[in-house]
């Protein structure tokens, strides 16, 4: 089952991005958005460690720039990270060029094939 269909131009612009998952696999994907946040991210990581759970953190590039220590903690503890744009901008409220530029700026810091658009 595919819940959300991204615009085809995004697939063309980002061919190495992960666009689909095997839907026959029985799995739960735990995700967090908008981090890293110094007051919250370490607490979440400790809780995930306690229960031996891995998650994916969709990071805002500007937050990664401001809080590199917390970003590195997520990576070092074996969690996946994904791009959530640099300034958490929603695509429908911005010109395509500006949106892609903002996404690419975040990608310079995050370097992931995972992307979640902000709502």
Predicted features, each with a name:
Residues 112-119:
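Internal catalytic-core helix/loop-beta-alpha segment
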């Amino acid at each position: 089952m595919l819940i959300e269909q991204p615009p085809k131009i995004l697939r063309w612009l980002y061919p190495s991005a992960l666009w689909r998952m095997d839907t026959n696999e029985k799995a739960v994907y735990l995700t967090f958005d908008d981090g890293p946040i110094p007051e919250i991210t370490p607490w979440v990581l400790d809780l995930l460690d306690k229960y031996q759970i891995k998650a994916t953190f969709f990071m805002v590039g500007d937050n990664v720039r401001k809080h590199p220590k917390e970003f590195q903690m997520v990576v070092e503890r074996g969690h996946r990270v994904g791009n959530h744009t640099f300034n958490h901008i929603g695509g429908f409220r911005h010109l395509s060029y500006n949106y892609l530029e903002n996404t690419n700026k975040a990608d310079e810091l995050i370097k992931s094939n995972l992307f979640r658009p902000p709502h």
